[in-house]
């Protein structure tokens, strides 16, 4: 449910154990009337050490979002605010005011392996954690562009050394003939 005019940020990170994690975080002001958080976990097969999804897994996620999640969120008045991809699962974060069981009913037929979590979160604390992660990433990017150490001083050029080895042949003036 990434519509026109929405601003999304991608943050790539690593967990403490070195496992790569990717976040997509939507930029929006919390809507306090949407006081429940709902998270969908969609597992995917992992085949390499990164434990990140392959192309088929991304296509499955896209199909789920377009054909199942977006219509359910629109019908029930929920807002998708972020996602996390790590260690064999996609996690989709959303806020709403409707009964979360209605979302479970609409989404569970897509795949029996889907997992669901919901909680009362009127202060949008989970979203605040995602935004804090985004701000940390922004600060790190700025840090990379403006290093903390002073630039190295330019050294004076070393004096030219005399060449050793075979000397270069001298240029000769062309000979002219006398008439």
List each language-model region with its residue ranges.
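Residue-level signal for functionally critical sites in structured catalytic/ligand-binding pockets
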Residues: 57, 61, 69, 80, ...
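Acidic, proline/glycine-rich low-complexity IDRs
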Residues: 1-8, 98-179
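Aromatic-enriched hydrophobic runs in primary sequence
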Residues: 51-54, 68, 94, 164, ...
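Amphipathic protein-protein interaction modules
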Residues: 63-113
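Residues in well-ordered beta-strands of folded domains
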Residues: 41, 95, 117
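Charge-rich, low-complexity segments
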Residues: 1-67, 74-81, 100-101, 129-152
């Amino acid at each position: 449910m990434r519509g026109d005019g929405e601003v999304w940020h991608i943050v790539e990170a690593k967990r403490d154990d070195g496992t790569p994690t990717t976040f997509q975080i939507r930029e929006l002001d919390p809507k306090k009337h949407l006081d429940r958080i709902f998270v969908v976990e969609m597992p995917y097969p992992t085949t390499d050490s990164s434990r990140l999804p392959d192309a088929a897994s991304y296509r499955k996620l896209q199909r789920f979002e377009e054909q199942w999640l977006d219509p359910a969120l629109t019908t029930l008045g929920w807002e998708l605010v972020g996602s996390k991809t790590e260690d064999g699962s996609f996690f989709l974060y959303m806020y709403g005011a409707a009964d979360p069981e209605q979302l479970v009913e609409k989404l569970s037929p897509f795949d029996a392996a889907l997992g669901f979590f919901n909680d009362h979160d009127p202060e949008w604390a989970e979203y605040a954690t995602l935004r804090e992660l985004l701000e940390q990433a922004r600060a790190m990017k700025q840090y990379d562009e403006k290093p903390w150490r002073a630039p190295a001083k330019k050294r004076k050029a070393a004096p030219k050394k005399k060449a050793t080895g075979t000397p270069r042949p001298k240029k000769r003036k062309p000979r002219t003939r006398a008439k």
